[in-house]
A protein has these predicted regions:
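Hydrophobic pocket/interface hotspot
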Residues: 21-22, 80
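Conserved catalytic-core motifs of GNAT/GCN5-like acyltransferases
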Residues: 115-118, 130, 135-153
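Helix-loop element at the rim of GNAT/NAT acetyltransferase active sites that forms part
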Residues: 12, 23-38
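Conserved N-terminal entry element of GNAT/NAT acetyltransferase domains
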Residues: 1-16, 160-169
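Active-site acidic-Proline motif in GNAT/NAT acetyltransferases
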Residues: 86-92, 120-121
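Short glycine/proline-centered loop/turn elements that form peptide/ligand docking sites
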Residues: 95, 99, 121-125, 142-148
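Conserved acetyl-CoA-binding loop-helix of GNAT-fold acetyltransferases
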Residues: 91-108, 127-131
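Acetyl-CoA-dependent GNAT
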Residues: 34-89, 99, 105, 160-164, ...
Length: 169
């Protein structure tokens, strides 16, 4: 699967991407929002073994800048995730476009609902999700502990095709 819009590409992650994915996933600054302020401690070989399915990379003008994923959770529902890992690509609307590309593709390919969750502290992500039409379902207060044992809260969202505001048209 490859999705393109303007200078952005979403494509299936390949073995050649494993080195960069491992670097991002081992970077606490990149992974803190997901509960791993010390990174995952994963090897390139472990990343290679886990590739496939809905693990994708994001390119801007051919440069790897992040990753996203989706998985079917049944009944036409897909759960998605995204990380714009390169800081010089953040706060420029890239994430909103990438999400629009991925969500549009999922809706065109039979999904009837998209779900996701994000850390309650990640206000930037919440703003992006809500601008795309996601509806906040619930806040899960102190629902889990990060790798340092600190309680974390999350926000659950859902998006229906009729509510979707695409930024990749």
């Amino acid at each position: 699967m490859t999705i393109q819009y303007e200078n952005l590409t979403i494509r299936q992650a390949e073995a050649a991407d494993a080195k960069q994915l491992a670097a991002w996933w081992n970077d606490g600054a990149v992974m803190a929002h997901a509960g791993f302020p010390n990174g995952l401690g994963i090897t390139e070989e472990e990343v290679k073994k886990g590739l496939g399915g809905g693990c994708m990379v994001i390119e801007e003008e051919g440069r790897l800048i992040g990753e996203c994923s989706y998985r079917s959770v049944g009944d036409g529902v897909a759960e998605i995730g995204i990380k714009i890992c390169e800081t010089d690509c953040q706060n420029r609307g890239v994430g909103r476009k990438i999400l629009s590309m991925l969500i549009g593709w999922l809706f065109q390919n039979g999904c009837s609902k998209i779900i996701l969750d994000t850390n309650l502290r990640n206000k930037r992500a919440q703003h992006v999700y809500e601008s795309l039409g996601f509806r906040k379902l619930r806040i899960n207060v102190d629902a889990w502990n990060d790798q340092l044992g600190q309680p974390q809260s999350s926000v659950d969202y859902e998006l229906l095709p009729t509510d979707f505001n695409s930024f990749a048209m």
